[in-house]
A protein has these predicted regions:
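Short, flexible loop segments at the rims of nucleotide/cofactor-binding pockets, characterized by
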Residues: 10-11, 82-88
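Short, flexible helix/strand-to-coil boundary loops that buttress conserved ligand/catalytic motifs
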Residues: 12-13, 47, 119, 137
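Short, hydrophobic alpha-helical packing/hinge segments within bilobed ligand-binding/sensory domains
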Residues: 22, 95-96
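Acidic, PIN/NYN-like endoribonuclease modules and their adjacent C-terminal/linker elements
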Residues: 86, 93, 100-106, 112-137
Length: 137
């Protein structure tokens, strides 16, 4: 499963939400998260933005610990093939490429409109965090 950056941020900002529960399930080994270097770099940059730190009530160190843990529990994906352009937003291409190259069954995002039908063309389900959580329970 690949989590779009918006889902990771939601998990930090709302500890009782579906996004946070997906992250906890990954920590417990109940699901496998896939991550590539470009996607992790985006997680790092976005999660450390002041607006997200303030909203989550977290420090930079708190988020660094979280991100370090994420690198331990996530399965690394090497990007052997790029499939660009598939999406209307070029910034989302790395998320889709991680899912394709990692042979993910699902890509979880709040921005489903940005991904359109592209994931389905590669046999990848496009899910909201709440949908992913329901399917895993």
């Amino acid at each position: 499963m690949v989590l779009d950056t918006d889902v990771v941020i939601a998990g930090l900002r709302s500890p009782t939400g579906a996004s946070a529960e997906l992250l906890r399930m990954a920590r417990r080994g109940e699901l496998t998260l896939l991550i590539s270097v470009p996607l992790f770099i985006e997680y790092d940059a976005k999660c450390l933005e002041k607006e997200h730190l303030d909203a989550a009530g977290l420090t930079t160190q708190d988020v660094q610990v979280f991100l370090d843990a994420l690198t331990v529990i996530a399965e690394p994906v090497s990007i052997h093939f790029t499939w660009r352009p598939q999406l209307t937003d070029p910034a989302d291409e790395m998320v889709l490429e991680t899912a394709i190259n990692g042979q993910a069954k699902a890509l979880v995002t709040f921005n489903q409109r940005h991904f359109g039908k592209a994931p389905a063309a590669f046999g990848i389900e496009l899910l909201l965090p709440s949908e992913a959580l329901r399917r895993l329970r």
